[in-house]
Design a protein with these regions (language model features):
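Active-site neighborhood of HAD-like aspartate-dependent phosphohydrolases
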Residues: 1-54
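Mg2+-dependent phosphoryl-transfer enzymes with acidic/Ser/Thr/Gly-rich catalytic loops
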Residues: 4, 28-38, 72-73, 77-79, ...
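Short, active-site-adjacent cap segments at secondary-structure transitions
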Residues: 21-22, 64-66, 112
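Short, catalytically relevant binding-site loops at active-site mouths
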Residues: 28, 61-65, 85
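Alpha-helix initiation and capping sites
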Residues: 38-42, 60, 83
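Substrate-recognition element of Asp-dependent hydrolases with the DxDx(T/V) motif
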Residues: 45-69, 80, 116
């Protein structure tokens, strides 16, 4: 679970894309890769942005779909073709003036392990490889690409005390 203490420190949400925001499948057949994103994940990322969090993507693969989805959601950054995620994470810390404990990171595979070991709130999706268990404090019930990000953002925003205020506009 994500404690209120840890959640209260979070200033940035950093997500892997393939296997976290998507189910990990990649479609070929044309000039561009085809990816499918869950609408609820996107809506809850918008709520995280509305709560004042820095939200961005850190992906080992480059894709126009990643950039378009990030732009649509108003995310702060997209880093692609990243082969050393820890090195890129350290750059993000410097660029945004963040400390590792102020970050939530979601991953699904061993390439994410070094970053998961550094952040304050390390999260794995339900169908992540078991090797991530040594580093994460929460494993979602939902698999990647099927609401895992929604689930995590809901827990984070609730633990931070932001959720009721963000949902007020829907309760009128």
């Amino acid at each position: 679970m994500i404690s209120a203490e840890k959640a209260g420190r979070v200033k940035a949400v950093i997500l892997d894309v393939d296997g976290v925001l998507t189910d990990g499948r990649v479609g070929y057949g044309g000039p561009e890769l085809i990816k499918f994103f869950h609408y609820r994940d996107g809506h809850w990322l918008k709520l995280a942005v509305r709560a004042g969090l820095i939200v961005g993507l850190l992906s080992g693969r480059s894709s126009r779909a990643n950039r378009e989805r990030a732009a649509e959601l108003g995310l702060s950054f997209v880093r692609e073709d990243v082969h050393d995620k820890l090195e890129e994470f350290e750059k993000l810390l410097r660029e945004y003036g963040l400390k590792p404990e102020e970050c939530l990171y979601m991953g699904d595979d061993v390439i994410d392990l070094p970053v998961l070991k550094r952040v304050g709130v390390p999260v794995a999706v339900a169908d992540a490889v078991p090797e991530l268990d040594e580093a994460v404090i929460y494993r979602t019930a939902a698999p990647g690409g099927h609401g895992a990000v929604c689930e995590t953002m809901r827990l984070l925003l609730k633990a931070r005390g932001d959720l009721d205020g963000l949902l007020e506009r829907y309760r009128r």
